[in-house]
């Protein structure tokens, strides 16, 4: 059965960040990560990275990646924020 939930294309995510005046690398560094780390969220599920990207775009992660937040058996959305490890921003 095919899912009706279509994720944003990675190029659309990158373009959205550019329109907001930022980039994947800049958001990675802003959140205390290596400059290329955040790009992992484009190709595989990573709740923390998805949240960082969504916040930078001014939306929610389930809007960008509905397939990652939808349970096909119960047809409900999953709260994946519970899967995130706690994270404290480094002091500058």
Curated annotation (Swiss-Prot):
Biological source species: Escherichia coli (strain K12)
Function: This protein is involved in positive regulation of the metabolism of sugars.
Pfam name, any one: HTH_35
Example GO molecular function: DNA binding
Transmembrane as UniProt keyword: no
Keywords recorded for this protein, A-Z: Activator, DNA-binding, Transcription, Transcription regulation
DNA-binding region(s), residue ranges: 50-69
NCBIfam families: PRK10344.1
Signal peptide: none
Name this protein carries in UniProt: Sugar fermentation stimulation protein B
Protein family according to the UniProt entry: Belongs to the ner transcriptional regulatory family.
């Amino acid at each position: 059965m095919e899912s009706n939930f279509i994720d944003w294309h990675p190029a659309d995510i990158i373009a959205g960040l550019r329109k907001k005046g930022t980039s994947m690398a800049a958001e990675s560094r802003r959140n205390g990560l290596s400059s290329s780390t955040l790009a992992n969220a484009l190709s595989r599920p990573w709740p923390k990275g998805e949240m960082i990207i969504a916040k930078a775009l001014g939306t929610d992660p389930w809007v960008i990646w509905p397939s990652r937040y939808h349970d096909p058996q119960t047809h409900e959305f999953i709260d994946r924020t519970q899967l995130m490890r706690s994270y404290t921003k480094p002091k500058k």
